[in-house]
UniProtKB/Swiss-Prot annotation:
It is found in: Secreted. Residues 158-163 form a propeptide. PANTHER family: RETINOIC ACID RECEPTOR RESPONDER PROTEIN 2. Keywords: Chemotaxis, Differentiation, Disulfide bond, Inflammatory response, Secreted, Signal. InterPro entries: Chemerin, Cystatin_sf. Adipocyte-secreted protein (adipokine) that regulates adipogenesis, metabolism and inflammation through activation of the chemokine-like receptor 1 (CMKLR1). Also acts as a ligand for CMKLR2. Can also bind to C-C chemokine receptor-like 2 (CCRL2), but with a lower affinity than it does to CMKLR1 or CMKLR2. Positively regulates adipocyte differentiation, modulates the expression of adipocyte genes involved in lipid and glucose metabolism and might play a role in angiogenesis, a process essential for the expansion of white adipose tissue. Its main location: secreted. Disulfide bonds join 77-87, 98-117, 101-135. GO terms for biological process: antifungal humoral response; antifungal innate immune response; cell differentiation; chemotaxis; defense response to Gram-negative bacterium; defense response to Gram-positive bacterium; embryonic digestive tract development; inflammatory response. Residues 1-20 form the signal peptide. It comes from Homo sapiens (Human). This is Retinoic acid receptor responder protein 2. The keyword Disulfide bond applies. The lineage of its organism: Eukaryota, Metazoa, Chordata, Craniata, Vertebrata. Induction: Inhibited in psoriatic lesions. Activated by tazarotene in skin rafts and in the epidermis of psoriatic lesions.
């Protein structure tokens, strides 16, 4: 069974997720991520999403946590015009690989967000681990810290008798 699951997982990872296949929460998360990316001051050109590598939404008591991995490519438009349909992807434009962690509350209120889109050549292993830690913080946004049990949270040890 395990032999079948590994090739299936590799195939699904290579195929990716189309934008049409995203849930409503995932589409909203992608929209929030693109808005956040284009607000960033160093970004001067508009970027367009070219593919969604993975998309997961998880319900929590405070809202829905959406984790997205997607790719962006530079367009011929300036960043203020990023929503315009006439913005076409530049064939040799810069490419970015993004990780977005968005926590949506009731009525799509954004409780927390993390959008990290380094240029594809700058992706480092240590940076990915750091981003995962920040992503977990976004995942817990708006949640009651006492509503979850974490192993070791209530660990006690019996003291040795005094001799």
């Amino acid at each position: 069974m395990r032999r079948l699951l590994i090739p299936l997982a590799l195939w699904l990872g290579a195929v990716g997720v189309g934008v049409a296949e995203l849930t409503e929460a995932q589409r909203r998360g992608l929209q929030v991520a693109l808005e956040e990316f284009h607000k960033h001051p160093p970004v001067q050109w508009a970027f367009q999403e070219t593919s969604v590598e993975s998309a997961v939404d998880t319900p929590f008591p405070a809202g829905i946590f959406v984790r997205l991995e997607f790719k962006l490519q530079q367009t011929s438009c300036r960043k203020r015009d990023w929503k315009k349909p006439e913005c076409k992807v530049r064939p040799n434009g810069r490419k970015r690989k993004c990780l977005a962690c968005i926590k949506l509350g009731s009525e799509d209120k954004v409780l927390g967000r993390l959008v990290h889109c380094p240029i594809e050549t700058q992706v480092l292993r240590e940076a990915e681990e750091h981003q995962e830690t920040q992503c977990l913080r976004v995942q817990r946004a708006g949640e009651d810290p006492h509503s979850f049990y974490f192993p070791g949270q209530f660990a006690f040890s019996k003291a040795l008798p005094r001799s």
